[in-house]
Structure formats: structure tokens, C-alpha cells
């Protein structure tokens, strides 16, 4: 089999149709899966000796949240080291990173695997992986044909990374380096709320504004602060952390501003406070709402004038510190109640950010679950940790009052339980491995008897039309992908669509 010009042109066209990089990457992967007739495909970005999934097709959704470190995945390491097409024999002793991650075939291992390293010049920027359940699935394609596919994918990924770098540089001062511009903590999530949060982080990171990060306990406010710092011009200087809720009143002022020898009993030497430690960098004040009103007044002075006084010292010290503050309280309500200073609130909330709770992030829970599964796999030395369909369904329907932190602990506990009940180093997480409390549901209301306005044939055809429309929308109006989703032959689907009046 050989690729026609039309096939390659179609792949190139799909890359241009997408709105934004994510959509283009998904179109590329979906099209490749159709052209190569593989069971699963993935586009991965290479960064710091790990592969980060950008788009997948035919794989469990939690793969998008996983981070594949080369040390734990010898096949991916082989792809990263290769300068060309890598074909793994069906009897390869190297474990496939996607074993157990093809929906409906969790217990089966991938047989055919091809890896295509992607380069920008001499630099490895990513990889394409193609997997199939038949041992000889890719034998019909020559290395030259696969190189053409890799070249198209590498061009798309390289352009996306270049645009990302240029956009980041435009937000930073002119003397910032490209490396500083793109360096940023990974925040996992594709939900609208997280997408908006990432955009706001990019905007505010390049400035020197104080930021107030609000959100429920366990949502990841510290991770947001870290992302802001690492994407800012201050990234080369320290990010200093202080949990205000853990500060005893007697030592709080010393922790913030430092003290001199003899300032109080036990002050046997001079000591720098967090503000001095964060000079020219960033200070992250977690749980800012827990500070006393007296300390709030002193913190306000630092924000206003940029100088501090160590406890027991009459001299002032100048500091250049950006303050990021976080709280799980509604500080506006705290101001009205007289527990938080209004002037400090306005100083801190120049650019407020809100981290959405996990229950409002949709499928992000599955991506995060995949991330934590991969973490557990590496820590416990397991060959694979996968989520069953029942476990994924449970995670999607639980509300997680403890947010991401609760999910992380739940995954770790489930892995330990599942490992104890299985022999070997492969773990499949089932719903019974999670100890979530029962959720009391309201009694169902009596359903009204529907008024029948169609005969059985009309109702059936209306249902078929709507099902096909939804499948087409989810697959970018690609009929072949739609047929695969509906588990029917594409020719039969075309005939049915014509009979239903959906095609000429």
C-alpha cells in the first residue's frame, strides 16, 4: 500500500482547518488513524526527558493527563533515541506504554507498535505513536511513507511551539530569553474554566502586579502561584512560600520580616524573614485570610512603600518583592465582617484569579486521574496502572468536596488496595477500590406520561437522525470516524443517512 497525493493533501488540509493548536492536533491524529487503519494513535510533545500527550485517538481519555518519563517507558526512550522510524516486533520484551489503555480491551496488550520521532532541525520536539492489535498491522507501510507522515506532524508541532514561544516573548520584557518565556509549570486540564485560568496566568505573569488567588481547599492554588512565578521575569530568583494559617501569632511577625539578636527571648542571632528571602523574587502567602489585623497593617505598609523592619530593629530595609496571595475564604465578606482590612484587600487583588473546583471541571477529573496513576506506577515500580470503565464512571460522578487533593489521595489509596489483591506488577483500578462516601440522592419525581405525536417509524427515524448528527459533530463531520463510533459500516451509514434525508 502507498499513500496517494490525495491522502497526504487531506492530512495537510486537516491541519489547516482546526481552530487553535489543540483542534489541529486532534484532527491530525484522527485522520492518521483512519488512513493507517490503526487501533490507537497519539501525538506527544517532548520536554525534560518525558513525553506529554497533546492529542490521542483510540486511547482512554486519562492518557491525556499522563506524563511518560523515559526512565519508566523503554519503548518511548527507544523512540527518543532514534533518528528515524522505530518498529517494535510483536514479541518485543519492551512493555508498551499503552497496554491496557485502549477502551474495551483493557486486558489485552498492544501487538503492533510504530514510533515516529519528530524533529525541528536537530532537536527532538515530540513523537507520533501508532498502535494496533494485529502483529503485522503496519507491515504494508514503508519507512519512507511513514517519514512523510512524521514530516507533516513535525511541521505542525514545530509551528505550534514557535507561535507559543513568540506569544510568550511578546508578553515579557525585551531582554527576556526564549527559554524564560516558555518555562512554566504544567497545569493539567482542558475544561473551559482551566483554559481560561491558563490564559489569565499567561497575561498576569509577565507583569509585576500582586495577584490574589481564590479557590476552595485542594484546588491547586499553590500550583497557580508557581506557574505565575515561573512564567515571569522573576523566574530566575526565588519563590518563597509561607502558610499563614500555620503561623503562631507570637512568631508571625518574625517569620515575615525577620528579627535581630536579642529582640526577644530565644533570638540568639539575626534572622532574615520571608520578605528578605524573596528579594527580587516572589513571595507566596497561602491562606492570607488567617493573618491578624495587626499583621495585615504591617503587610500593607510593605506593599505600599517596599520597606520592612526586622523585629527589634529601628532601621528599614528596602525589598523588591512581588506578592502572590491565596485564600479559600471570600475576602469581600471578611472585609464586611471587619476581619480583613479593605485597603489590604484592594492592594492584593489588583489581578484576582479564581481556581475552579474539580466538580466544575468535567472530564479534567479523568486526565488528573491518569496523571496520578502514572505517578503511582513510577513510585511503586509497577509495569502499569490503569482505570477500569467502572472506575472512570465513578470518578466522573463523584463531586470531590476535597477537590484535586482528594482525588490524588483516592488514587494512591486505590492503587495500594488493588496491588494487595493482585499478583504481579500490573494493577487495574476497579470501582470497589475507591472508598467514597455514599451520596444521598433526592427521591425521583414521578415521570409524566409523554404524549405520543409520532408513530413508531417516525420516532425511530428521528432518533437515528439525532444520533448521527451528534456523532458527526463529535468527529468533525468525518463520516468514517462517525461510523466507527456508531459501530457500523461506513457504506451502510451513508445509505441510512440518504434514506433519512441527511444526504443527497
UniProtKB/Swiss-Prot annotation:
InterPro entries: AAA+_ATPase, GAF, GAF-like_dom_sf, Homeodomain-like_sf, NorR, P-loop_NTPase, Sigma_54_int, Sigma_54_int_dom_ATP-bd_1. The modification 4-aspartylphosphate is found at residue 57. Pathway: Nitrogen metabolism; nitric oxide reduction. SMART domains: AAA (SM00382), GAF (SM00065). One of its GO terms (biological process) is phosphorelay signal transduction system. The keyword ATP-binding applies. This is Anaerobic nitric oxide reductase transcription regulator NorR. It comes from Escherichia coli O9:H4 (strain HS). The gene is norR.
